[in-house]
Every structure is written in structure tokens, then in C-alpha cells.
């Protein structure tokens, strides 16, 4: 048959169908999660996952609502409103619609890539919902809408376990020799194993366990699994380490999450002047 013309309406129709199919089962059953946690109670990690699931439910509900409404517009059951036109226009340009973006996380991805990212985030949250009393062996920090809250939870757990004052604790990072999340055998003995970090402006030397200069034409260097824990500020020894800012996206600035500590043989100033940073979502 003849190929359909590439018009905003045709692109909008195609996206509407595929997105509704993609996310048809994506609402998390928070009542079930509550029941599962009734006996064991909710710790700091559980609270973060619950917040993340609730936020994702709100986003998914809006995505579905707006697409069903757009479908009614296409079918002539509703008059096309300005909001519906904007939604259709964004999909045509492969951009994340504003009404979705407002409920989502910082992202510089085009829409097609964002939807894949969205599915990956849902997968991590669903895996947690299936066994909410267990702390995951390793956590994809990039998959959280609010990654800072997970780092705070790490501090809270250590403060409770070790009877320390929460406000005197600082997040400490140790880059492990575990190259990928699949290779993590069990949960970290202290703190949590996290992945999803990329180094921008430098690379990580796995053999020597230190920061080094990037290779020519190398954009980002995926990091091994990082063990995030916490220490009282007065016990922190920064010798041989540099404070590396971690951001959610390549936009940096307002997307700052925390400062990690990375090992270096060079003076820290070298990396600071080069603008080296960890990025949680390089947004391919």
C-alpha cells in the first residue's frame, strides 16, 4: 500500500498506539507493597522506593490520560484543544511533551530514547515491588527521579546502625573493581552498591583504580559499580582523592546531586580545572 504521509497527526496516532501498549501494565500496586511491608516495617530504602513508585504512577496516569484524550480528538469525539495540539506537536518533533516532563525527571533525551529510559526505570521499580522487604544487591541510581533521597537513605541506615548523628555524616564513595551490575554477588556490607555513573572529561583506570586523562575522541567513560557509604566529616581523609561533582544530566548546573570522592595520583586541581564530573544520564 501507499506509505502514510509524515504529518503531526499520523506521527501522533502511531506514538499514541505504541506508548499505550508499552505502558499498559505500568502502574505499581502500592496497596500490595504496603501489605508486604506490614510485618517488617518501612526503612529508609523502602521509603525512597515508595516515593519513586508513587511519582511514576502519577506520571504514567498523566501519559495515559493525555493519550486517550488525544485519541478521542483523532476520532472526532472531542474537539482538538490547544493542549492536545501541543502534545501532538511534541511527539512529531520527537520531544518530551511539557505536561509529562513536569511530572518526570531531569532529561535531555529525545522522546523515543526517553520512552526506553522510562521503561528501564519502571523495570527497576517493579523488581523492587516484587520483593519490597529486601534491599536490592545493587541499585541503578540513574533510574530515580530523586537520586539524592537514596543517598540520604544510605546515611540514615548507617546513622541508625552505628548510632551516629545523621547531620554529621557525609556520603563517601569507593569505586569497586566490579565492572558491571550483573557481576554483583551480594549487597554491600556497608552502604549500597550503585551503578549508572559515567565520567565526563576524564576516564577511570580500572587496573590502577584511579582517575586518568581521557583517550582521544572518548566522550564518556562508564564507571564500575560504586560503593556509597557514609562517614562522620571529621573522620574523612581526602588525601589522594578529589571531590568530583555528580549531575543528573549533561546540562549539569541545576541537576547537581552530590560530590563523589575519586582516587587520583595527579593533583585534584587538574581535574577540577578540566571540569571533570560524573553524569547519571548522558542521554544517548
Where are these regions (language model features)?
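Long C-terminal appendages of very large multidomain proteins
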Residues: 1-284
Amino acid at each position: 500500500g501507499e506509505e502514510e504521509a509524515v504529518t503531526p497527526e499520523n506521527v501522533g496516532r502511531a506514538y499514541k498506539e505504541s506508548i499505550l501498549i508499552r505502558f499498559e501494565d505500568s502502574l505499581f500496586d502500592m496497596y500490595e507493597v504496603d501489605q508486604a511491608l506490614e510485618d517488617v516495617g518501612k526503612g529508609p530504602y523502602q521509603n525512597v522506593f515508595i516515593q519513586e513508585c508513587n511519582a511514576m504512577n502519577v506520571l504514567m496516569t498523566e501519559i495515559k490520560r493525555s493519550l486517550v484524550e488525544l485519541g478521542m480528538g483523532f476520532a472526532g469525539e472531542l474537539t482538538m484543544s490547544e493542549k492536545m495540539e501541543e502534545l501532538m506537536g511534541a511527539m512529531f518533533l520527537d520531544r518530551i511533551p511539557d505536561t509529562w516532563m513536569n511530572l518526570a525527571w531531569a532529561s535531555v533525551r529525545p522522546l523515543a530514547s526517553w520512552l526506553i529510559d522510562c521503561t528501564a526505570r519502571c523495570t527497576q521499580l517493579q523488581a523492587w515491588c516484587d520483593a519490597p522487604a529486601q534491599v536490592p544487591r545493587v541499585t541503578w541510581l540513574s533510574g530515580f527521579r530523586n537520586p539524592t533521597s537514596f543517598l540520604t537513605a544510605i546515611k540514615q541506615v548507617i546513622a541508625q546502625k552505628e548510632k551516629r548523628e545523621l547531620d554529621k555524616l557525609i556520603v563517601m564513595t569507593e569505586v569497586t573493581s566490579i565492572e558491571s551490575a550483573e557481576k554483583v554477588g551480594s549487597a554491600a556490607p556497608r552502604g549500597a552498591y550503585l551503578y549508572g555513573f559515567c565520567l565526563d572529561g576524564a576516564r577511570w583506570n580500572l587496573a590502577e583504580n584511579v582517575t586518568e586523562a581521557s583517550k582521544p575522541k572518548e566522550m564518556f567513560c562508564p564507571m564500575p559499580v560504586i560503593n556509597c557509604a557514609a562517614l562522620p566529616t571529621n573522620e574523612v581523609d581526602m588525601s589522594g582523592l578529589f571531590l568530583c561533582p555528580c549531575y543528573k544530566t549533561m546540562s549539569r548546573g541545576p541537576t547537581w546531586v552530590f560530590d563523589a570522592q575519586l582516587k587520583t595520583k595527579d593533583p585534584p586541581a587538574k581535574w577540577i580545572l578540566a571540569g571533570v564530573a560524573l553524569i547519571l544520564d548522558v542521554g544517548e
